[in-house]
């Protein structure tokens, strides 16, 4: 089967690689550098499994800048373009998704479009009405950055949308896509759910908001423990050995961040509109409170250090270990709060060659020099290369994992 994938981020590329084991896949992107890398068997993103599969597996995959040619020949078109949260309108910016829909429909009269981008509840219904077609369906993704292909190979569940009154072809394509994902997975007995588009859209937003809730819960627990000088590690262990709670997603941090959780929680809150709620709003608020608390704690520790020059060293901007993504990283908001207090910030981030022009921080990518300059070293996730300056480190990473 010929499949086109719009977007080569961790969602699009991981799906493209997965499906190219048994199908002919064309990745569409607007960046020549990404297209060149994929066509040379290199991954433009950091993902161990994607890198290995591109290098070592027999894949039928190519990348192109020629979107119309790719869409014209495709039987299925997967849309995995960004839907960033627009704080001005308090809603996802879906213009990239809509642009692809319009382009595909203009050159292809038979392909079914499968949206993998995270979208607002009701978006598929809106697009079907706008473009007067039922050939647009939704399949939420449940992937972790840097482990996206692994999560596609070992999925927790597969969800594809379909409506009762859809045409036989669209129904068949929805089932076909679910089967493609299931047959490519290495995990056996993966649950497959076919449901309405709005329900599938809700699953995605509520699932990520629950994960954000867990992060916020254990962060608030940690805030209490640190404030009362209690052992946060022991409290969390004592709670998490309860099977109903579990020993996962319980490691304190500076706040939830990354590409998905911040925007998905805000979008779900916006979707509530006039529907009664308090919990969803509290999750978003809790994350902001946590980042403010962390900044205050850093300032308190800094003031205790007897030094005429106060320098905060930020070790890594990435949100998670083994990630190459700084988007919506909680530490960036903490940095902004510290800078508003006229505190000098130096940053160690080997994935950057320079900071943005308006950033008043200083990039110091010589690790030993960084360690010497900083009075306190702040890190969301601890790394063993800080072991020799452990007395300088402030982190709430209790379990040394994400």
Curated annotation (Swiss-Prot):
Position of the signal peptide: none
Q: In which pathway does it act?
A: Nucleotide-sugar biosynthesis; UDP-alpha-D-glucuronate biosynthesis; UDP-alpha-D-glucuronate from UDP-alpha-D-glucose: step 1/1
Q: Which SMART domains match?
A: UDPG_MGDP_dh_C (SM00984)
- The residues responsible for catalysis, as annotated, are 260
Q: Which residues bind NAD(+)?
A: 2-19, 29, 34, 83, 118, 145, 259, 263, 327
Q: Name one GO biological process term.
A: UDP-glucuronate biosynthetic process
Q: Which UniProt keywords apply?
A: Capsule biogenesis/degradation, NAD, Oxidoreductase
Against Pfam families, the record matches this protein to: UDPG_MGDP_dh, UDPG_MGDP_dh_C, UDPG_MGDP_dh_N
Q: Which PANTHER family does the entry link to?
A: UDP-GLUCOSE 6-DEHYDROGENASE (PTHR43750:SF2), UDP-GLUCOSE 6-DEHYDROGENASE TUAD (PTHR43750)
Q: What is this protein called?
A: UDP-glucose 6-dehydrogenase
GN (gene name): hasB
